[in-house]
Amino acid sequence: MDDLQLDGIHVIQKKDGFRFGIDAVLLANFANVKNGNRVVDLCSGTGIVPFIIAGKTKASSITGIEIQEDMVEMANRSAMFNKLQDKIEFICEDLTNIDIMKKIPKVDVVTVNPPYKLYNSGIVNPSDKMAIARHEICCNLEDVIIACRTLLKDNKRMYMVHRPDRLADIITLMRKNKIEPKRIQMVHPNTKKAPNIVLIEGQRDGGAFLKWEPPIYVYNDKGGYSDQIEAIYGRK
């Protein structure tokens, strides 16, 4: 069990299974969730993004959607442990099943930390559960974007974390599915290295206007977390 150091929230995770990384923390921080918003988190894993959003905002409800049953079970146990079951729920569904997505009441915000790697690229993790989390096995990038559009109310927004080498694909597929890119932020390991994470906000049926946010640098010159990251973790 991991302590998020946020309102006493703890998240149940397996030591030898998929564990959340800084990308999920960055995504939860990047998402603009307003008081009373209803939120869906796709590819939710063990629920780190919903739990951070619950701790930092006054969202009225947060639903995590995850295809792997054991992760859903752990996430719901975490919700009960933190006495957040009235605010957060996790359901085991396939986001490519658009009929199911259409049955979910439309929301103000969708967040997603999808598999980054194409199925036929790199070495596929021998553990199926790890591979599903990292490779486009159960869904691809367009499936994710279509699900986001299906879940969003008119003019409401999605937030995604991904890899910069897929940015052209992300923007192309967002526009194909009438989600307009509105805000992009690059994340670099440090000031000397190229970005390895991209955060992007899109608006369903939005007008054309794109804002570039200042970059985030994860580590400082001494090898410790930067002031930006310390602030995101609530330590500054």
Model-derived features with residue positions:
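Conserved Class I SAM-dependent methyltransferase catalytic core
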Residues: 10, 138-188, 193-195
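SAM/dcSAM-binding transferase cores
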Residues: 192-236
